[in-house]
Amino acid sequence: MQKPLSETIKTLLIINVLLFFASTYFIPNLSDPLFSLWHVNNPNFKLWQILTHMFMHGNLSHLIFNMFSLYMFAPIIEERLGTSYFLFLYFSAGFAAAALTLGIDYYSFQEIFNAYLKTGLTSTEIYEFIQESLQRGSFDTQIAPNIPTNDTINMLRNYGGTMVGASGAISGVLVAFAVLYPNLPLMLLFIPFPIKAKYFIGAYFLLDVYGGLTGNSIIGPENTCLLYTSDAADD
């Protein structure tokens, strides 16, 4: 039986929904550049984005999926832990997911950036190349012909992309649910038989790892960066 929603969970749901519709239909600049989480080397990066990105979502399906998970699993976790510990879990998981993603992106960016430095370009020239490429939506492959195109695309994605979503926080709630109630049977609309929480949530995360590797993450923080194509040198 579904637990009734507390004021805490209602507030989280309402804030997420209101900010999504506000940023989508009324204040388009609310998400970018203010509230979405940018790469740490990007001038748009601000410390508050580590919190605010958790209340932004890139599309309606992402919002619905996260809010449905919050609605289904959060009430029983809050009842078990208490409101204070539940909020600590929720935001700590969100912060940890953001820190991990920022760290991975920073390492990946610096690795490719250093490869560009070895070609003889200066840091200033590389950043100018990045900014011009982002503005154009494409880049000149002849700037550093020995660097693989995919590496340049990844560098541009890391620098020019933003991260949004409550998925990291939701993941923390799901892990807590699997740890506290591993054998609780779950009845799901798309599965015609009960499945234990530990198996369902375990499969859920495995699918997300696969999705992250293929670029179609289910629950990971959504990255809203654009794709970039290469131009010939004489363009």
Which role does the model predict for each range below?
Residues D231-D235:
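A short, hydrophobic C-terminal helix/tail in secreted or cell-surface proteins
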Residues M1-S230:
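A detector for small-residue-rich transmembrane helices and their helix-helix packing motifs
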